Amino acid sequence: MPRFEVGMGALWVGGQPLGTKAATETTGPGGSAPLFSTSSDLAGAAGIDGRVGVRLTRALVAEAEASYLTPQLRVAISGDFEGAAAVTATETVQQFTIGGGVLWYLPNGGRARRFAPFAVAGGGYLRQLHDQGTLVDTGRYYQVGGGATYLLASGRHFHTNGIGARVDVRAFFRSKGVAFDGGGHTSPAAGLTAFVRF
């Protein structure tokens, strides 16, 4: 039974709304007058990810993973009290994650040895650089999902025990990091990875 697995591939994380805020001016009687409002979101983006897995049992694998992508941070400004046209400001955010998780191969009754469905869950550290790398936001991420692996070649070939492809879909939850509402945000994510087993 192969014990180690190394994979590298493409990752996509969907957009995440970051909330809305209204800028106001305090008036003399203690009230407030609206100046403008902002609506922010982190756009969906593609990137790369890599992982190393250690098989604990026939069905259970412990994984370490890392990813990098560059989503656009968009801030839309509208409702200016002087009637100025709405405008959207954008900047590129460099997003890094490093963490771990557990993968569980689901029983398939031995119907297809090359095809193996699984469930996966994990989490880790989130780091985001923006404003040309001068500002740093950190947080945590958590994810849960599932997918399948497909063995393209099995048995020993050039010191390996198998080569295959993996596809998965996940719910990606981000806590803190780049955000203007102080809350957590969830978006869909998907990955396609080539892997080698040893």
Please name every model-derived segment.
Residues G19-K21, P71-L73, T149-F198:
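Predominantly the C-terminal beta-signal and adjacent terminal strand-loop region
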Residues R3, A43-I48, Q95-G99, G139-Q143, ...:
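Transmembrane beta-barrel architecture of outer-membrane proteins
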Residues G30-S37, E82-V87, Q128-H130, S175-G177:
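Extracytoplasmic loops and strand-loop junctions of Gram-negative outer membrane beta-barrel proteins
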Residues V6-M8, P117-G123, G164-R170:
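Extended hydrophobic secondary-structure segments that form protein cores and membrane-embedded regions
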Residues A22-P29, S78-A85, L135-G139, D181-S187:
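Flexible, surface-exposed loop regions and adjacent strand-edge segments
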Residues M1-V54, G123, G191-T193, R197:
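Short glycine/proline- and aromatic-enriched beta-strand/turn motifs that initiate or cap beta-hairpins
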Residues A10-G14, R51-Y141, Y150-G155:
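Gram-negative (and chloroplast) outer-membrane scaffold detector with strong preference
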Residues L42-G44, T92-Q94, R113-F115, V136-T138, ...:
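A generic structural micro-feature
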